[in-house]
Curated annotation (Swiss-Prot):
Residue numbers binding phosphate: R86, G124, T125, R126
EC number of the protein: 2.7.7.56
Organism: Carboxydothermus hydrogenoformans (strain ATCC BAA-161 / DSM 6008 / Z-2901)
Record GO biological process: rRNA catabolic process; rRNA processing; tRNA processing
Alphabetical list of PROSITE patterns matching this protein: RIBONUCLEASE_PH
Protein name stated in the entry: Ribonuclease PH
Any single Pfam family the record assigns to this protein: RNase_PH_C
Domain of life: Bacteria
Record GO terms (molecular function): 3'-5'-RNA exonuclease activity; tRNA binding; tRNA nucleotidyltransferase activity
Function (record text): Phosphorolytic 3'-5' exoribonuclease that plays an important role in tRNA 3'-end maturation. Removes nucleotide residues following the 3'-CCA terminus of tRNAs; can also add nucleotides to the ends of RNA molecules by using nucleoside diphosphates as substrates, but this may not be physiologically important. Probably plays a role in initiation of 16S rRNA degradation (leading to ribosome degradation) during starvation.
Gene name of the record: rph
Length: 254
C-alpha cells in the first residue's frame, strides 16, 4: 500500500473541469490528486516567422508555477528576469506532445497558444499539464469548427501523459511529490490513444534499471494513459467522437 493508500497501478483521483476560464477559446482545470493545473488554449491568426508561407499552423506552449503552488514560496520567474531550464524543458515537452496529434496543415496558418499554470503542485505537474492541455486544445479547435473556420477538428488522435517510477523497490503509477522525491527511477511517458509513444523521459536516480523493468514501467504507464484518455473523452462529451474523423475520411477516400 502506498503513502496515500493507492494500489501500485492506481492513478490519483482525476477531475477535469472544462470551460474554466471565461475568455479563453478552450480551457480546463485538471486535478490529479493534490496537483492542480489550469490549461488554456488561445487561437492566433498568424504563425511564427519560421512557419510563414508553409501553409500550416503551429502549436506552442508556456508553463509556469504560482509562487505558493509549492510548500514554500517560489520567486516568480518574471521577477528573476529569466525562465529556468526546467520550465523551458517542460514547455517544449507540452508543445511536442500536442503537435504529435495535430494535423498542422489542416489547421492552416494559425497558432494555438497553450498556457499551463500550476496553482498547486504535488508531483506530476508536467504530465497533468499535457493531459489537461489536450482537452483545452480540443475545445478551442471545436470552436473554430462551430464558427465555420475549419471543416473538421484537425486532431488525429488523443494524447495524455503520466509518470511511473520505482519507489522502495516497487514499480508504481502516477507518483505524488513524496514518492517522486525518493524514487530510484522516475519516468514521464506521453502516449496517444492508439498506443503510440510521443515521448519517454526516464532517469535513474543513483540507480540503474533493466530492460525488463523498463518494459514493465512502460506497460504500467500505458494502463494509466488509457484511463486518462477515457477521462478526456468524458470531459469532451460529443466533441470526443469527432476527434480522428479527418483520418477516417482520408482512409475511406483511398
Amino acid at each position: 500500500m502506498r503513502i496515500d493508500g493507492r494500489e501500485k497501478d492506481q492513478l490519483r483521483t482525476v477531475k477535469i473541469t472544462t470551460n474554466y476560464i471565461k475568455h479563453a477559446e478552450g480551457s480546463v482545470l485538471i486535478e490529479m490528486g493534490d496537483t492542480r493545473v489550469v490549461c488554456t488554449a488561445t487561437v492566433e491568426d498568424k504563425v511564427p516567422p519560421f512557419a510563414k508561407g508553409e501553409g500550416k499552423g503551429w502549436i506552442t506552449a508556456e508553463y509556469g508555477m504560482l509562487p505558493r503552488s509549492t510548500e514554500t514560496r517560489n520567486v516568480r520567474e518574471a521577477t528573476k528576469g529569466r525562465q529556468s531550464g526546467r520550465t523551458l524543458e517542460i514547455q517544449r515537452l507540452i508543445g511536442r506532445a500536442l503537435r504529435g496529434v495535430v494535423d498542422l496543415k489542416a489547421l492552416g496558418e494559425r497558432t494555438l497558444w497553450i498556457d499551463c499554470d500550476v496553482i498547486q503542485a504535488d508531483g506530476g505537474t508536467r504530465t497533468a499539464a499535457i493531459t489537461g492541455s489536450f482537452v483545452a486544445l480540443a475545445l478551442a479547435l471545436n470552436k473554430l469548427v462551430e464558427e465555420g473556420i475549419l471543416p473538421v477538428i484537425p486532431l488525429k488522435d488523443f494524447v495524455a501523459a503520466v509518470s511511473v517510477g520505482i519507489v522502495d523497490g516497487e514499480e508504481i503509477l502516477d507518483l505524488n511529490f513524496e514518492e517522486d522525491s525518493k524514487a530510484l527511477v522516475d519516468m514521464n511517458v506521453v502516449m496517444t490513444g492508439s498506443n503510440r509513444f510521443v515521448e519517454v523521459q526516464g532517469t535513474g536516480e543513483e540507480a540503474t534499471f533493466s530492460m525488463e523493468e523498463l518494459q514493465r514501467l512502460l506497460t504500467l504507464a500505458q494502463k494509466g494513459i488509457r484511463e486518462l484518455i477515457e477521462l478526456q473523452k468524458q470531459a469532451l462529451g460529443d466533441i470526443a467522437r469527432r476527434i480522428g474523423m479527418e483520418n477516417a475520411a482520408d482512409s475511406n477516400s483511398q
